[in-house]
Amino acid sequence: MLYPNQKTLATIAGVVVSPLNPMYTSLILSKGLKMGPLEGIKILDLSLYGPGRYCSMILADLGAEVITVEIPRSAGKMFGMMTSDTEAHYIGLNRNKKSIALNIKKDEGKEIFYRLAKKVDVILETNRPGTLKRRGMDYETVSKLNPRIVYCSITGYGQNGPYARRPGHDINFVAMAGILGLSGSKNGPPSYIVSPMIADVLGGTNQAVIAIIAAL
């Protein structure tokens, strides 16, 4: 499924994908520099929020071909700052990427996912542990279709342990780490450090980028 006002960019594994906000290309691509250290690497991004999208943005800037899987009818509505019909964070985090709207809860959507999984080099996801396993989209399943796949999962509390199934965002993690306790006035409550997203970026994005590149 293509989003409105977007032209077809490519067909991969028989699946048509489209450009994400083609008017907002990065400086590198707009200057006509076509090569990058990850040129030829294909990445399927199942993530929804900052850590995963920022990770695949960096990989796309390095030359990888990134295809983001969007929830139908929700593209561009997941972040906070609106610009016309598309949010500013969404535009920034999805530069240089392609997209496909896919309902992975349905058999048809999963079949398309499997076709793409056979052709890509990397799959990136940010679901809670066990979510994609229940849908038959976990590493064990995908690696049987594509033994060379690099499968990266970004989670808040790891794959196992007492907190593994808990949802969480940056503010939860920095609070648990005690960072919020270092902020604010001496006798007042802590103040949330708005930017940068310390836990999401340093603990999630950066480590994921390093791990993926190392695995490749």
Where are these regions (language model features)?
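Extreme N-terminal basic, low-complexity initiation segments
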Residues: 2-8
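Hydrophobic alpha-helical signal/anchor motif
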Residues: 3, 18-20
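N-terminal helix-loop segment corresponding to the beta1-alpha1 unit
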Residues: 24-216
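Acidic, Ala/Val/Gly-enriched low-complexity intrinsically disordered segments
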Residues: 10-17
